[in-house]
Structures are given as C-alpha cells and as structure tokens.
Regions:
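Intrinsically disordered, low-complexity, charged terminal extensions of DNA damage-control enzymes
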Residues: 1-142
Length: 142
C-alpha cells in the first residue's frame, strides 16, 4: 500500500471591499501590517466584507473625507495558496486630500507607487484605475 496524499483543505474565503480613492491628482494607499499575508507592502484601502455604496460613503465620511462622486467597479478574485479574496470595489472622487488628517492612509501621486510604494498584484483589478504599473511589472520589463 502506498501512502495516500492528504486532501487539501479548502481555501478560506475573505470578502473585501477595495476603494480607489482619488482627488484628481493624488490617490490613497496604506501600508499593510508587519506580519501576515503581504506583510509590510502597500495596498489600496479596503474593508472587510462586501459593503454597499451607502456603507462606503459612511465610512469615508467617518474617515474625514468628503466624497464628490462614487462608482461601483467590477468584482474580482485573487487566489493565494490558502486564502481567496473575493473583492468588490468602488472608485471614489473626493475633495482635496491635502487637508486629510487620517492616520493610516497616504495620499501620493499614482506614479510614485511604481518606485516607492509597490502594490501587490492581488489588487491588479483595481490598480488600473490609478493608471500605474504594479510592483512586479516594473521588474518583468527589465
């Protein structure tokens, strides 16, 4: 008798709402925690669960942002070895970000993400709305 291969455990599914927050020239990103999946990398702001447009608007206002326009984006999925992210997204135009005083988001020119703030490919469905290349893509071209 040959040893039997253990069956793979099903991946854990995490629902997320990804936000592409812009003020015209700047976009919001934030740093991921130092431990865990994609540790220490930058990401687009995202929230647990699939939020409605009204829930997203409420969250933005709680963060001290003033949304002008919001548009729903297509759903996306990213598969890691042990986790699947099932994502929905919104692109949000807000008033000037210069006066934002929140603690965990950075507002940068999207081109700066290419060199200084690489964003993981897990967010590729939404980074197109920033018109930037992802962290890995800049190395693939060389």
């Amino acid at each position: 008798d040959y040893p039997k291969k253990a069956q793979k455990k099903p991946r854990k599914i995490e629902k997320k709402t990804v936000l592409v927050i812009r003020d015209g020239s700047s976009a919001a990103i934030r740093k991921r925690p130092a431990k865990g999946l994609l540790a220490g990398l930058y990401e687009l702001p995202n929230l647990s669960g699939w939020l409605s447009q009204d829930e997203v608007l409420d969250w933005l206002k709680q963060e001290g942002l003033s949304p002008i326009r919001i548009r729903r984006l297509l759903d996306a999925k990213h598969i890691f070895s042990h986790i699947e992210w099932h994502m929905t997204g919104y692109v949000v135009l807000v008033e000037e970000l210069e006066n934002y005083s929140g603690k965990d988001m950075l507002f940068i020119e999207p081109k700066r993400t290419e060199e200084e703030y690489p964003i993981p490919a897990a967010f590729s469905a939404y980074t197109a709305y920033l018109q930037i290349r992802l962290g890995q893509e800049k190395y693939d071209e060389k």
